A protein has these predicted regions:
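Compact integral membrane and secretory-pathway proteins
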Residues: 1-155
Length: 155
């Protein structure tokens, strides 16, 4: 169950980053175009905001790591990558959605799609971590229980 949910949420989050996030004038802008513009204009030159803007293109890679690790039964890696990517996308989408709008600049539906899918990715990753920890503790409680195989960890 968790590999499917994490994969779908990660794919939706990555897909949402390519949807229109902002409309400026007559043009829709994706998250990548928006952050490239912020960087070019010097609004995100230093500090945590600068790092957040520059590391944004790595989000699809981290989402792919979360999905692949989940299918491989590596729930700690998957949960960490999924929760990190989900929280990162969720935070940035909330900032863009909460920004003041003008008659020339306003947010589009892609930012809401990304916000929702990132929330699902974060929740699925945290639930996967909780399930993995529960199974880990249960395995330690019964010393006679055989070691799990990669196939048995997929649910």
């Amino acid at each position: 169950m968790f590999p499917t949910l994490v994969t779908l949420a990660a794919a939706a989050t990555v897909g949402g980053t390519f949807l229109p996030w902002l409309r400026s004038g007559k043009h829709d802008r994706t998250s990548y175009q928006l952050l490239s513009l912020l960087d070019s204009l010097g609004f995100a030159s230093a500090g945590p905001v600068g790092w957040a803007v520059r590391l944004w293109p790595l989000l699809p890679l981290v989402c792919a790591i979360a999905a692949v690790a989940s299918w491989r039964g590596m729930w700690p890696v998957s949960s960490l990558a999924g929760a990190g990517a989900g929280a990162y996308a969720l935070g940035l989408a909330m900032v863009v959605r909460g920004a003041s709008t003008t008659s020339f600049i306003y947010d589009r539906w892609g930012v809401t799609f990304t916000l929702v899918s990132a929330l699902v990715l974060t929740a699925a990753s945290l639930a996967q971590a909780g399930d993995g920890m529960r199974r880990f503790v249960d395995d330690d409680a019964d010393p006679e229980r055989p070691a799990p195989t990669p196939e048995s960890t997929r649910r």
